[in-house]
A protein has these predicted regions:
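OB-fold/S1-family single-stranded nucleic acid-binding modules
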Residues: 114-130
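Structural detector for short beta-strands of small beta-barrel domains
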Residues: 34-68, 110
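OB-fold (S1/OB) nucleic-acid-binding surfaces
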Residues: 57-85
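Positively charged n-region of N-terminal signal peptides that target proteins for export
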Residues: 1-5
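Short nucleic-acid-contacting surface segments enriched for D/E, G, S/T with interspersed K/R
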Residues: 91-107
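Bacterial N-terminal signal peptides
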Residues: 7-19
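Cleaved targeting-peptide boundary
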Residues: 20-32
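Flexible glycine-rich surface loops and low-complexity tracts that mediate binding to linear polymers
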Residues: 38-40, 102-116
């Protein structure tokens, strides 16, 4: 029960963050990020943060959570940085480019943002990583 509460809180926080980005875009405000390339594992951030779940054994669960609305994260396993995946336009699916790569290592080209210690990326191009 405690884990469900934690997962619910993480999911709600991610949805609020994504919604705030969508609203900013609707008001004609320009997003200010840096075009970057990130290589890392596509993870379900709620399960990774709360229960340290990742890898091939967690692929099906991660895909189910993504289909239910949880945005993926990109975990840079070389330095431990987790990038929350965002979408750059309102009502778009942030997981669209990543669904086939759940729990795999990919290279993502996109716009990276950092605020108050949190990092996020809006993917523009995804290729299978090494």
């Amino acid at each position: 029960m405690r884990y469900l509460s934690i997962l619910g809180a993480l999911a709600m926080g991610a949805m609020i963050f994504v919604s705030s980005q969508a609203i900013a875009g609707q008001d004609g405000m320009k997003m200010h990020g840096t075009d970057s390339t990130v290589t890392g594992r596509v993870v379900d951030p709620a399960c990774y943060i709360a229960m340290d779940l990742k890898g091939a054994a967690h692929k099906e669960c991660a895909q189910k959570c993504a289909k239910a609305g949880q945005a993926f994260g990109i975990l840079d396993e070389t330095n431990g940085i987790l990038y929350q995946v965002l979408e750059g336009s309102p009502m778009a699916d942030p997981n669209a480019l990543l669904m086939d790569h759940a729990e795999e290592v990919v290279t993502v080209k996109g716009m990276v943002f950092e605020k108050n210690g949190m990092k996020a990326i809006v993917p523009k191009e995804v290729t299978k990583g090494s």
